[in-house]
Amino acid sequence: MIQAEEFVIVEKKHLDNFTILYVEGLIKLGESAEFFSSALENVLKNESTNVIIDFTKIDYIDSTGIGELVGYLGKFTTQNRKLIIVNPSERIQKLLKLAKLDAVFKIYNNEEEAIAAESGSPAPR
């Protein structure tokens, strides 16, 4: 477990061509947003996989966190890679929709659905 302020990367795992980051807490201005950014930068520079961020345990994200997501979406896209969000809470879904980012990000209910849709193989049962 890697931790900063109120933000924690609980686990990182690899599955097929995806790195999955399991995160929890708050992504907001300050140390937590910087830590979130460094985790994404680490995957961007040190791995050649697509990234899935599991938002199941993210309670809050502010404009700084949203800005980091949008910035890294551009960086991953430039490298022909994907940045995918899974399991966002209803509150986060509303926020993404309000900012019209639900049309920009690939958002799925769970990692299995995301991997199946983005790799072209059927979801595991």
Show which residues each predicted segment covers.
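STAS-typified acidic loop motif
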Residues: 4-38
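General small-molecule cofactor/ligand-binding pocket signal
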Residues: 13, 86, 108
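Short, flexible active-site-adjacent loop segments at beta-strand->alpha-helix junctions, enriched
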Residues: 25, 89, 111
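Short acidic-hydrophobic, aromatic-tinged amphipathic segments that line or gate anion-handling sites
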Residues: 106-110, 114
